[in-house]
Amino acid sequence: MESRMDQYEIMEQVGRGAFGAAILVNHKIERKKYVLKKIRLARQTERCRKSAHQEMALIARLQHPYIVEFKEAWVEKGCYVCIVTGYCEGGDMDELMKKLNGTYFPEEKLLKWFAQLVLAVDYLHSNYVLHRDLKCSNIFLTKDQDIRLGDFGLAKTLKEDDLTSSVVGTPNYMCPELLTDIPYGFKSDIWSLGCCMYEMAAHRPAFKAFDMAGLISKINRSSIGPLPACYSSSMKTLIKSMLRKSPEHRPTASEILKNPYLQPYVNQCRPLSDAPTPIRMPEKPLSTSRSNQRCTSESQSSSISCSDIDSTQSSDRSTSGGAPSTDSKLNDIRSIQDADRADSDEKCVTPEDLRGNKNISGAELKRQDSSKSVHQHHRGESKQPKIIEKIMTTLREESRLRENNSPVSSSGVKLTSAVSNKNQAEQSSESSRPHSGVSYSSKFGDISSNGWTNTSDECVDPVQVPLQLKQLSPTVEHCPKLKNSGSSTPEPAKQIAENGSSASGMSKTKSSPSSSRRPSPQRQTVAGIPIVPFTVSKRAHIKAESEKTPPRPAHSPNNSLHNLPPLIPISTNLSEENIKLGNSQAMPAPLEFVTAASKEDISFYSNSVVDCVEKAEPSEVFESNSPAYLTPPWTGPVLDAKGENGLIAIPCSEIHTGTLQKSMASNDDSSLSSPLDTFYLSFEQEFVCKDDSQSSKHGHSAVTLLSGEDKFTVQELLASTPVISPFVSSTSNTLPEDKSSYQSFKKQSDSHSGPPVDVPAQTIRLNSFLVSDEWPTSETVQGEARDTAASKLLNVVREDFDVRSSSCSTSTQPSGQTPVRSKLNVPETNLASNISIPSISEAVRLSTAMDVKPYTSEASNGVKEEASPAKEALDVTSFRQRAEALEGLLELSADLLENNRLEELAIVLQPFGKNKVSPRETAIWLARSFKGMMNEEGGRLSM
């Protein structure tokens, strides 16, 4: 049988989109150029396959002067979807703007294009089609510079006044209601059209930021820059009216066409579209083709469109040539249906989707959330971090999903909680967890890696749905996923429940098998304060899981903690606490603990071990194969962020500011300053480990908190004295078998007492030399926040890889050893820590081991940095990361040149050059290291 491809002569590839290649072809008989969009189904995920079929069927029934011309479509050999559209010689709008190099379009031309675009969008909306991916790279130009709107790969058919909720499109063009997970409708296309018109006028995106958090913030505030002064105020007002935050305040496409300022251009363009051009509906196979199209398009893309990867290239290019006859297109559609039936198994689509039963149409998949619309605006702010995580994760996982080619199994309903932990995220394909008000279809949704289940839904004619299809159809009840639920079982403030209702307040959420199997940590309390273990997992374990861990609030409404990973107890008010000690010592500052344990085994990396810290206070810190437990022998009222508890609970599955921020008692950024300040401080001061009876010198660990990428690494700094077992021991014998109480624990710890030893502390420096295998970023040191009472800056200790390996070996101890407890009498000159980071409101100066006096630092006046988004993996192709690296290198080079430090400047610039391969991580590492040294020298000179 002769293939339809034989009718075309392949000329060249003109673009590559999200789902396939765009090839310029020449029709052998017509001698006319077309664009062939060829999508190989075998290499696509189920989502991409459905999108290909949806685009093929949808564009076949669209006919408008300002929409790409449809020639024909078919399934080639059961494994390719071929869509032939007209070729646009003028390219796309994005390419044209780049060629102009900053020269603005005349206002008359912009308004003409605007009128053509609005006419096309009005045609789509009047036929209940939502484009969902309006952007400049999808606006094509003919040889006569007329508009053709294309790329319907994400389009969706909606019932009138209906809404959808799938997160699709290009982030810069997404509307606020989509980003806040509020169901959206046709007004989302109006927002995207406003973004396009702004970009066409200003030659820059309406909303642009270096990270997703900044972009979403600008979109939610509708914060746009001024348009060029060469345009009239009427045009500016028209563009801004489409970029209003509330969908109700945006005009519809038909209302824009009635705008008096645009009327002359609409009348000029309307003669081409005066004749009514309804959507083409074949007579005989009406129910078959439409049910086929709608059923195959029920599951629209529920992740970010990949078409913005190659936004300057497109697979939809068209001209205004004549369309084939209705009979030929009827045959095309029939052939498409036949091929779909023959290859239904190859495409991994249900038979109901492809066979087009006459009593079942896409109208039957009725949405359950159409009544829940913009009244849910109150959920927006609390859901924003999860939306950020969702968008960033789906962007990263898009290519991986296509490569794996693993459609979601239809054997059972798969649900994941929006606030599942990383173990739950790993087993999301196996667990089945009820969610109040939400039912997902495993056949029509993709489960993203961060535990969020995306579904796509469609609202069309209300027809009775058979039970079999109802089980497959996605229905989403949009309930606030972060609402406070009073139905959680209250617990005493002294205990932390490992299993129970999650801190997000979602009622009736079962724990996954992984969390139910995990042993509960020991619960110990002293003076009504819960003590929580803190473990730092090895980087190798965290690397693949950190992106999967969604943010979670730490406190439930009844002020108890539920279902939390290992946490750090941190006192929050160092200068106001009234410490009452039972051993009649002078009043020291409250202790702070940092300990680390390997999660899977006792093998430590040198950058994943943190020694126990106690300031002038007898205590015992130990760990076993289970998470470590910390018990402070002090009492006194302590205020947390809400003034109720003495702890700030910080999950440690990935230690960075983004996770810390999201795991506090509130999702509100304004409540983070006090608890986070103290948390930073606990890592950036030098600590002393002391006991009444025995002391020994051991390796100190400096934890450097980096504000740039919001991550920290740990350096093992070893003393020159004989090697002694580290303070953090891996023995399981020190853990009480019955996990009883603090008294039994302290009684056991007192059995290891010995004679005290006075040793000088080894001074350490918080620097930028990192042991981590991930690329570093510089920490911000504010000179004005340094305390003049401190004697000097901490000295530089630089470890080579031999020392790191030895520290790694010494940090790993065989089981059966008891922890070593030390007493350090350290001179004030070596202990004064005067390093201050922005957002730190308090600092602690350690005067002696017996007399530690807290004081309030001047750092509260420092500039508070905006919370950074969740940590991203190293990506040398990321424009934001490359921009930050370039800025740091330029700043460093300028400083070196100004100080006439040419040798160091030569070292910094050595990896760069025409004939050199310059690994960015190496160059950045050098830049941060030298910059940190310069900051230290500047601090010494200023004293």
From Swiss-Prot:
Record-annotated Protein kinase domain positions: 8-262
Tissue expr: Expressed in anthers, pistils and leaves.
Cellular component terms per the entry's GO annotation: cortical microtubule
Name this protein carries in UniProt: Serine/threonine-protein kinase Nek4
Residues involved in ATP binding: 14-22, 37
Annotated GO biological process: cortical microtubule organization; microtubule-based process
SMART domains in UniProt: S_TKc
PROSITE patterns xrefs: PROTEIN_KINASE_ATP (PS00107), PROTEIN_KINASE_DOM (PS50011), PROTEIN_KINASE_ST (PS00108)
Positions of transmembrane segments: none
Keywords: ATP-binding, Kinase, Nucleotide-binding, Serine/threonine-protein kinase, Transferase
Active site (catalytic residues): 133 (proton acceptor)
Biased composition (Basic and acidic residues): 329-356, 379-403
Record's compositionally biased regions (Polar residues): 316-328, 404-431, 438-447, 728-746
Molecular function terms from GO: ATP binding; protein serine kinase activity; protein serine/threonine kinase activity
E.C. designation(s): 2.7.11.1
Biased composition (Low complexity): 295-315, 500-519, 805-819
The UniProt record lists the keyword Transferase: yes
Family stated for the protein in its record: Belongs to the protein kinase superfamily. NEK Ser/Thr protein kinase family. NIMA subfamily.
Function, as annotated: May be involved in plant development processes.
Reaction equations catalysed: L-seryl-[protein] + ATP = O-phospho-L-seryl-[protein] + ADP + H(+); L-threonyl-[protein] + ATP = O-phospho-L-threonyl-[protein] + ADP + H(+)
Organism, as annotated: Oryza sativa subsp. japonica (Rice)
